[in-house]
């Protein structure tokens, strides 16, 4: 292409330019080139030196991408530093929907449907070929052959998170630059005196390879209307550019099946502080360019309330465009600062120093939204995942790839925000292909290039009889041998010895498969059993990756089975539903007929899918529901999507069709009070009574779980077979040493210390065991829990009932505000005292839990602890539902409100999705509530009710204590429907331990001699005052400014400890904090320090220090702080 000289000036120009090129490995190279050389020629000139082909180079200067047809001198880069990043070459045309079977990733999600259209001003953001998401599909045989899964999670050099942050910032800077260029070229702004356009234009627009998600508008003419945060389009488009790199037309030689990432070195690639400074300087320049538009922005918004645009349509459009563009620029600018704000440089390190981050990127990663689903599906695209598969299969037709192109597929799926990359369906690797009838194990390698997790895995359980175009044939009978149970048992022992792989044998396959998308459905009955195990296997593998990586994960999902539409051989996004019914299969070798259950409705299937993926199949309605080829749904971290798949998979090997798998039981009772992260289930049935897994010994189950988990944990650096604690695991990955330490940030008080104890003693295997109803981990932790409660809960006192009640009150005194805040915005049943009701209820429940922990020493400790948690959960839900007049929406609002308050700092989209899921699950639980009204009416307290015989003492203890109900309910309330049913089958929960309220009340009244001298209604009030004054929660000293604004009466009643003015107290406190001991006895040291002359000298020194500080503090004003002035500045 010839250079464009239209912008050349008549000014005398130098003959040569010295250009410095900095690459992502922090190396800077200097090139001297001719001044008339254009950018494209310059790229070719430096290609050999930087080892990056010219078509993959992207040169960035001051946040702008250098255009190939411009001359270098137009950008004024002489003597300046240009940043070079590598990207995939732009496509010259769109793929045709199916490429030449090399396993490439160019097929669009809709199997060749055209990409989403873009606005005229839109720009496609090229992305550096790392640190973003690569999605793909892989297929599993259904003939019972094994699947060898290698999960490699080594980080690529670009995955230095500080480097990723800088690259992200540079990308957003480029986006802002594009918006500024558009604003600077608007004629109406120039007429108003706006800045003149610079020699800048949007980056080149390589043709899109995948359709844009429905919810995303990538910098269109109205960018402010985009629903998605800025990183979404960038990351989505990164996939667009990585995918074409794998296109067979651009990749020389036969490529292996699946994407082939560019080779990287293993050396760390941390950026230097100087690079950070350059980015900040560029941001400063952008802010200065934005200032003129901001001024106009202020003017337009200032007059927007009253401006009349009736006769000025053009002016209105111009102002609206300005508002949109400036608003979008501010959003990108703010997100850029957010991405950079966590970068730090530790000056204590030895040179050369580099940047590090103080908060993981997942804190800011925003999921994309699939609006086609029944509820929005969040998809996190913040990392790179490449999935490659190799194996043998019948050779495809020359032009057919995994998703066969055809109108059937396009009609059966909907546009999605993900790019489906077929990695296991491509042509066989080089070499002679075996006969079609031969089936070998497939190897699926999932390469995860970041500690930050991924998320898109499409899985299709492929029929072994696939015909040459990817068309599955219909088997005529069960293909699985009767010995699948033995096969599984033989495979499992290999787990600990081969920690880098997981070997899975599939249970009985389905009787029939859907036919080709273009043809009619295959005649025959779809077997729910086989499809259930298909989905279970998909969930096990795909859920496993995300379950342990603490991010949303895509797992298998299918379309409803009432009239299953044709499905492609490769899974893809579902068109309008998120329904899947995963059920346990029949006995191996037995009749493969589904149980004769009526077909559930569409809504039932939706609930089945939601509950099935989050907490296991939901009730009998899910059984036998035929589903089509699995596609997509979402499993949240902290909920056992993987566990459900494991459960179904293991249950398929039992000798009889088992009931639904056990729901996740709650963690130990105290943890329920601690407000764990959103999404972690805290409620469920304690015993797996009568369930399929009961026949599995804990040792066998542990070996299975350990083998599966060791695959990922080994990839993350854990030793094979090690039982690394959750705290150690997170500390090692985060690089921080103060996570889960008592007293550290986020671990305050008793509950924080308890959570720390649990995380330090539980491994991930223990958590899986607990979630499946095995209480052995709790039983093992009994000594530590008992010691912890004795020291932190009772303060070393004897565990008598009165001491336990007093300790509960002390612990909960500061939590009452949470109860009040939680119910402040909902309508409570008239006459009900919701605060007192919850406090007394929680008091009683926690007393029984604490008494059990402190007193129980037998082998029933763990089982009883889970039972107490379940009892408290259901009664709490039933009680508050009654107090809210039976309004489920009000109860859901209370729970979701607490979740939002607890989730400050968590991605808002994720929180919104979580609250939606909680509401759906809560509805199922309440429909099967095992606790009747009679069981909870005794807890209800009404306004003005005379104190019940004893309510007060437990109330107080309770009062403060039960403030934790909300945290507990939010985390625990969303229990699975199966949990409620199991609890119902066990009968009403047992009465709480301890005597009745009346007995306790009577005892309390008898122990208070003054109670008879006052009116009965005053007794509880006086008792509460006595207890609250006796046990005031300590708080740190308050500042002078805070105290000066506090009412005098409140200030006088403050019980917080102020600064210690006595030398003996100050020295003893400092010595205790430092762990120092006096040379003499503490008593003699205290006597010496209490001498009047020493005390007076200390007071004078303290006064002098404060006076000096006040004189040097520019913010101190005697008029504003008169008390400080009188106390310290004036002469005595």
UniProtKB/Swiss-Prot annotation:
| Annotated segments matching region Required for interaction with GET4 | 1010-1040
A single MF term (Gene Ontology): ubiquitin protein ligase binding
What residues bear Phosphothreonine in this entry? 117, 350, 1053
Q: Where is the composition biased (Gly residues)?
A: 681-692
Effect of mutating residue 1085 to R: No effect on interaction with UBL4A. No effect on interaction with UBL4A. Abolishes on interaction with UBL4A
Q: Name one GO cellular component term.
A: cytoplasm
The UniProt annotation puts the region (BAG-similar domain, required and sufficient for interaction with UBL4A) at: 1058-1115
Post-translational changes noted in the entry: Ricin can induce a cleavage by the caspase CASP3. The released C-terminal peptide induces apoptosis.
Q: What is the effect of changing residue 1018 to A?
A: Decreases interaction with GET4. Localizes in the nucleus. Decreases interaction with GET4, localizes in the nucleus and increases GET4 ubiquitination
Tissue expr: Expressed by immature dendritic cells (at protein level).
**What CDD domains has UniProt attached to this entry?**
Ubl_BAG6 (cd01809)
Pfam family, any one: Bag6_BAGS
Where are the residues marked Cleavage as a site? 1001-1002
UniProt motif Nuclear localization site: location: 1012-1054
Q: Where is the composition biased (Low complexity)?
A: 95-108, 408-426, 569-586, 1005-1020, 1066-1076
Cite the entry's keywords alphabetically: Acetylation, Apoptosis, Chaperone, Chromatin regulator, Cytoplasm, Differentiation, Immunity, Nucleus, Phosphoprotein, Repeat, Secreted, Spermatogenesis, Transport, Ubl conjugation
Q: List the disulfide bonds.
A: none
- Ubiquitin-like domain ranges (all copies): 17-92
Annotated consequence of substituting residue 1067 to R: No effect on interaction with UBL4A. No effect on interaction with UBL4A. Abolishes on interaction with UBL4A
**Residues annotated as region Disordered?**
87-126, 189-272, 385-441, 461-528, 560-603, 651-692, 947-1132
User: PANTHER family, alphabetically?
Assistant: LARGE PROLINE-RICH PROTEIN BAG6
Q: What does this protein do?
A: ATP-independent molecular chaperone preventing the aggregation of misfolded and hydrophobic patches-containing proteins. Functions as part of a cytosolic protein quality control complex, the BAG6/BAT3 complex, which maintains these client proteins in a soluble state and participates in their proper delivery to the endoplasmic reticulum or alternatively can promote their sorting to the proteasome where they undergo degradation. The BAG6/BAT3 complex is involved in the post-translational delivery of tail-anchored/type II transmembrane proteins to the endoplasmic reticulum membrane.
How is this protein named in the record? Answer: Large proline-rich protein BAG6
What is the species listed in this Swiss-Prot or TrEMBL entry?
Answer: Homo sapiens
UniProt gene name: BAG6
């Amino acid at each position: 292409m010839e250079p464009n000289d239209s912008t050349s000036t008549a000014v005398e120009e130098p003959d040569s330019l010295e250009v410095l090129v900095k690459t992502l490995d922090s190396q800077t190279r200097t090139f001297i080139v001719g001044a008339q050389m254009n950018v494209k020629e310059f790229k070719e000139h430096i290609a050999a030196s930087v080892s990056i082909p010219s078509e993959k180079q992207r040169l960035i200067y001051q946040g702008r991408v250098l255009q190939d047809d411009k001359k270098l001198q137009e950008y004024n880069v002489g003597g300046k530093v240009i940043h070079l990043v590598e990207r995939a070459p732009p496509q010259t045309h769109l793929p045709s929907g199916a490429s030449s079977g090399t396993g490439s990733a160019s097929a669009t999600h809709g199997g060749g449907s055209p990409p989403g259209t873009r606005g005229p001003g839109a720009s496609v953001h090229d992305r550096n070929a790392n640190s973003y998401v690569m999605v793909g599909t892989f297929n599993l045989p259904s003939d019972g052959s094994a699947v060898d899964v290698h999960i490699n999670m080594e980080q690529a050099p670009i995955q230095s998170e500080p480097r990723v942050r800088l690259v992200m910032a540079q990308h957003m800077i480029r986006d802002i630059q594009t918006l500024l260029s558009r604003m600077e070229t608007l004629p109406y702004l120039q007429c108003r005196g706006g800045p003149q356009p610079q020699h800048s234009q949007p980056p080149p627009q390589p043709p899109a390879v995948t359709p844009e998600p429905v919810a995303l508008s990538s910098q269109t003419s109205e960018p402010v209307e985009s629903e998605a945060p800025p990183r979404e389009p960038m990351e989505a488009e990164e996939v667009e550019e990585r995918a074409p790199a794998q296109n067979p037309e651009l990749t020389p030689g036969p490529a292996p099946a699946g994407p082939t990432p560019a080779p990287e070195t293993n050396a760390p690639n941390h950026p230097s502080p100087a690079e950070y400074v350059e980015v900040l300087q560029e941001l400063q320049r952008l802010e200065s360019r934005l200032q003129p538009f901001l001024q106009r922005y202020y003017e337009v918004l200032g007059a927007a309330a009253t401006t009349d645009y009736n006769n000025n349509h053009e002016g209105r459009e111009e102002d609206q465009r300005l508002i949109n563009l400036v608003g979008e620029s501010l959003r990108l600018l703010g997100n850029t600062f957010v991405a950079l704000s966590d970068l730090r440089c530790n000056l204590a390190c030895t040179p050369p120093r580099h940047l590090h981050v103080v908060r993981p990127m997942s804190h800011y990663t925003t999921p994309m939204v699939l609006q086609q689903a029944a509820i929005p599906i969040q998809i996190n695209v913040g990392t790179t995942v490449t999935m490659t598969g190799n194996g043998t299969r019948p050779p495809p037709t020359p032009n057919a790839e995994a998703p066969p192109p055809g109108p059937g597929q396009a009609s059966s799926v909907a546009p999605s925000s993900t790019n489906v990359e077929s990695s296991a369906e491509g042509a066989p690797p080089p070499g002679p292909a075996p006969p079609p009838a031969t089936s070998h194990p497939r190897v699926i390698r999932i390469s995860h290039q970041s500690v930050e997790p991924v998320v898109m895995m499409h899985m299709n359980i492929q029929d072994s009889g696939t015909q040459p175009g990817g068309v599955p044939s219909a088997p005529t009978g069960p293909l699985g041998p009767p010995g699948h149970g033995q096969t599984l048992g033989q495979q499992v022992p290999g787990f600990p010895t081969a920690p880098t792989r997981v070997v899975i044998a599939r249970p009985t396959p389905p009787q029939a498969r859907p036919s080709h998308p273009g043809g009619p459905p295959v005649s025959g009955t779809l077997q729910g059993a086989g499809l259930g195990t298909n989905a279970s296997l998909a969930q096990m593998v795909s859920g496993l990756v995300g379950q342990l990586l603490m991010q949303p994960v895509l797992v298998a999902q299918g379309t409803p089975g009432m009239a299953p539409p044709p499905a492609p051989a490769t899974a893809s996004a579902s068109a309008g539903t998120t329904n899947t019914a995963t059920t346990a299969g029949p006995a191996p070798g037995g009749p493969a007929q589904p149980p004769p259950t009526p077909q559930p409705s569409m809504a039932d299937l939706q609930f089945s899918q939601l509950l099935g993926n989050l907490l296991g199949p939901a009730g009998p309605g899910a059984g036998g529901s035929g589903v089509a080829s699995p596609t997509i749904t979402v499993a949240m971290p902290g909920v056992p999507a993987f566990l459900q798949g494991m459960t179904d998979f293991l249950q398929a090997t039992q000798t009889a069709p088992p009931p639904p798998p056990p729901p996740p039981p709650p963690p130990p009772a105290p943890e329920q009070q601690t407000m764990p992260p959103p999404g972690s289930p805290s409620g469920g049935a304690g015993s797996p009574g009568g369930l399929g897994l009961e026949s599995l010994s804990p040792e066998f189950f542990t070996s299975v779980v350990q083998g599966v988990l060791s695959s990922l944990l080994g990839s993350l650096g854990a030793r094979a077979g090690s039982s690394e604690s959750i705290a150690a695991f997170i500390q090692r990955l985060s690089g921080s040493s103060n996570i889960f330490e008592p007293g550290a940030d986020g671990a305050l008080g008793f509950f924080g210390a308890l959570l720390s104890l649990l995380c330090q003693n539980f491994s991930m295997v223990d958590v899986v065991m607990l979630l499946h109803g095995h209480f052995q981990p709790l039983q093992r932790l009994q000594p530590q829990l008992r010691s912890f409660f004795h020291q932190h809960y009772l303060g070393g006192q004897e565990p008598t009932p009165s001491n336990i009640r007093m300790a509960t009150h002390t612990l909960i005194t500061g939590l009452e505000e949470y109860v009040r805040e939680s119910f402040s915005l909902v309508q409570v049943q008239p006459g009900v005292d919701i605060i007192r009701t919850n406090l007394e209820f929680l008091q009683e429940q926690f007393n029984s839990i604490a008494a059990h922990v402190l007193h129980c020493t037998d082998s029933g400790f763990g089982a009883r602890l889970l039972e107490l948690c379940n009892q408290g959960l259901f009664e709490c839900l039933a009680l508050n539902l009654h107090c809210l007049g039976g309004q489920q929406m009000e109860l859901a609002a209370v729970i979701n409100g607490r979740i939002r308050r607890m989730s400050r700092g968590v991605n808002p989209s994720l929180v919104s999705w979580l609250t939606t899921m909680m509401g759906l699950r809560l509805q199922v639980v309440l429909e099967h509530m095992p606790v009747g009204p009679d069981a909870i009416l005794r807890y209800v307290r009404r306004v003005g009710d005379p104190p019940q015989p004893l309510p007060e003492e437990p109330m107080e203890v309770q009062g403060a204590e039960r403030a934790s109900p909300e945290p507990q309910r939010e985390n625990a309330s969303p229990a699975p429907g199966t949990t409620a049913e199991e609890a119902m089958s066990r009968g009403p929960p047992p009465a709480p331990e301890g005597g009745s309220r009346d007995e306790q009340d009577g005892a309390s009244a008898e122990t208070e001699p003054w109670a008879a001298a006052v009116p009965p209604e005053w007794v509880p009030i006086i008792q509460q005052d006595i207890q609250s004054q006796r046990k005031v929660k300590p708080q740190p000293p308050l500042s002078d400014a805070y105290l000066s604004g506090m009412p005098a009466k409140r200030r006088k009643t403050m019980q917080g400890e102020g600064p210690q003015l006595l030398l003996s107290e100050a020295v003893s406190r400092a010595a205790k904090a430092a762990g120092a001991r006096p040379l003499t006895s503490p008593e003699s040291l205290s006597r010496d320090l209490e001498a009047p002359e020493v005390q007076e000298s200390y007071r004078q020194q303290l006064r002098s220090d404060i006076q000096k500080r006040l004189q040097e503090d520019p913010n101190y004003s005697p008029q504003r702080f008169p008390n400080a002035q009188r106390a310290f500045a004036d002469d005595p």
